[in-house]
C-alpha cells in the first residue's frame, strides 16, 4: 500500500491542473503536467503554447490607452472677438482710428465726372439709352458696288468700321429694349430695317475687295512671266531691257516745210496769208457784189 508521502506529489499536480487560471499566474509560465513532461519539449513548441495561451486568456483590448484628441494647436479656442488680449503691450497709440465716411453719391454718376467726348458714347444714338423708332428709321440707302469701286483703300477701311459700329449700336438698342421690358406689337422693325441696310453696304465692300484681289492676282501672274520684272525681293523690281530697235528712215521721204499755210486756190479768191500792196490788186479778182457786176475802183482826183 502506497504511503501518503508518495501520493502527495501526484495530488498536488492534479490540484494544480484543476485550479482556475488567473490573469496573474496564467501569463507567467505555461502549465506543466505529466503529459507535457512525457513529450519532448522544444523552445519553439513552448513559445507557441505561450502565445496561444495569451490570446485565449487575455480579455483586454490590444491597445487599451487613451485616444489622443488634440491637434497640438496652442491657439485652439482663442477667439478674435472674445479674447483676453495680447500678452504684452505693443507700440500702438491709444487714439481712435478714423472711421470712413459714407458718401451719399456712391454708385451714382455725376455730370462733372462724365467725359462728354468719351469713346463709349459712340455706341449710343445721341447719348440716349433707348432710341425712338423715328430715330432708328432716319437713315439713307446702302452703298452700291459701282460707287465703292472708285473709293481708296482708306475710305473702304473707314466705311467698314463705321458699319461695324452701327451694327453694335443696333444690337445695343435691341438688347436694352429687352432688358427694360418695352413691349410693342413689333418694336424691332425699324432696327432690323436699319441693320439690313448696313449689311448690304458691307456686302458691297466685300464685293469690291474681291474684285481688287482678282485683279491683283492676274497682274502678279503677268509680272511673273515678264523678264523685266523681278519679284524675288532682291534687287530692283523693274529692269528695262537694253536692246532698242533702230528706226528705218529709208521709207520716209523728206518734204520741204512750208513757211506758211496755204489753202486750195479757187476762182476769184486770193491765197490766204499772202500780203500785197493796194496798187497791185487786180480789180477783177475782187468778189462781185450782190448785183453780179464787178466792183471797179472809183476815179481818183488829180
Swiss-Prot record:
Annotated transit peptide: 1-38
Family named by the database record: Belongs to the universal ribosomal protein uL29 family.
Protein's cellular compartments: Mitochondrion
Biological process per Gene Ontology, one example term: mitochondrial translation
MF term (GO), any: structural constituent of ribosome
Region entry Disordered, spans: 255-302
A GO CC term assigned to this protein in UniProt: mitochondrial large ribosomal subunit
Keywords on record: Mitochondrion, Ribonucleoprotein, Ribosomal protein, Transit peptide
Summary of subunit composition and partner proteins: Component of the mitochondrial large ribosomal subunit. Mature mitochondrial ribosomes consist of a small (37S) and a large (54S) subunit. The 37S subunit contains at least 33 different proteins and 1 molecule of RNA (15S). The 54S subunit contains at least 45 different proteins and 1 molecule of RNA (21S).
Predominant location category: mitochondrion
Name of the molecule in the record: Large ribosomal subunit protein uL29m
Organism encoding this protein: Pyricularia oryzae (strain 70-15 / ATCC MYA-4617 / FGSC 8958) (Rice blast fungus)
Amino acid at each position: 500500500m502506497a504511503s501518503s508521502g508518495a501520493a502527495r506529489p501526484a495530488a498536488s499536480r492534479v490540484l494544480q491542473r484543476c485550479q482556475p487560471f488567473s490573469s496573474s499566474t496564467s501569463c507567467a509560465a505555461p502549465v506543466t503536467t505529466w503529459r507535457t513532461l512525457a513529450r519532448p519539449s522544444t523552445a519553439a513548441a513552448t513559445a507557441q503554447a505561450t502565445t496561444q495561451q495569451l490570446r485565449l486568456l487575455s480579455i483586454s483590448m490590444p491597445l487599451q490607452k487613451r485616444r489622443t484628441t488634440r491637434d497640438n494647436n496652442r491657439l485652439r479656442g482663442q477667439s478674435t472677438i472674445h479674447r483676453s488680449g495680447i500678452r504684452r503691450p505693443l507700440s500702438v497709440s491709444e487714439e481712435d482710428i478714423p472711421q470712413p465716411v459714407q458718401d451719399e453719391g456712391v454708385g451714382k454718376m455725376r455730370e462733372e465726372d462724365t467725359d462728354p467726348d468719351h469713346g463709349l458714347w459712340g455706341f449710343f444714338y445721341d447719348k440716349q439709352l433707348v432710341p425712338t423708332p423715328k430715330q432708328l428709321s432716319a437713315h439713307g440707302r446702302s452703298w452700291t458696288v459701282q460707287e465703292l469701286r472708285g473709293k481708296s483703300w482708306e475710305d473702304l477701311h473707314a466705311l467698314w468700321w463705321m458699319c461695324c459700329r452701327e451694327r453694335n449700336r443696333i444690337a445695343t438698342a435691341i438688347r436694352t429694349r429687352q432688358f427694360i421690358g418695352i413691349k410693342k406689337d413689333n418694336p424691332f422693325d425699324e432696327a432690323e430695317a436699319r441693320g439690313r441696310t448696313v449689311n448690304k453696304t458691307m456686302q458691297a465692300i466685300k464685293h469690291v475687295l474681291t474684285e481688287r484681289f482678282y485683279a491683283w492676282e492676274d497682274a502678279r501672274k503677268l509680272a511673273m512671266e515678264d523678264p523685266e520684272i523681278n519679284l524675288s525681293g532682291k534687287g530692283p523690281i523693274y529692269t528695262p531691257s537694253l536692246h532698242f530697235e533702230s528706226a528705218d528712215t529709208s521709207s520716209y521721204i523728206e518734204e520741204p516745210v512750208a513757211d506758211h499755210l496755204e489753202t486750195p486756190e479757187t476762182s476769184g479768191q486770193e491765197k490766204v496769208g499772202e500780203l500785197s500792196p493796194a496798187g497791185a490788186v487786180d480789180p477783177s479778182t475782187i468778189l462781185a457784189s450782190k448785183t453780179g457786176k464787178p466792183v471797179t475802183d472809183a476815179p481818183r482826183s488829180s
